Amino acid sequence: MPLWSIAEGIPTLDVIKAHQFVEQKGAMLIGPNCPGLISPGKSMVGILPGQVFLEGNVGVISRSGTLTYEIVYHLTANGMGQSTAIGIGGDPVVGLHFRQLLEMFQNDPETEAIV
């Protein structure tokens, strides 16, 4: 089960402790300082502007919320929908990292490309 944290500026040691706790419970931490995640047409958690997303097969991962929206805007404008878009957060220490999410997208039958 993913847990999501929008808050920014959380002290680094607190994030490390939270990450360790979440891992011990078999869950995943997304963030902090992230816009959330969305699988268009299915579910959304966070502050993502859902109207720019289109259901499709492109996975999106970014540290920047604004860059996520910009990428998705251009994908959608060109008819390329998204399977899931995830903002991992811009703080120095975050829960899930690019490598972990790339592996998840590679194993996702609904994702054919990753940005």
Where are these regions (language model features)?
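Catalytic-core regions of core metabolic enzymes
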Residues: M1-V115
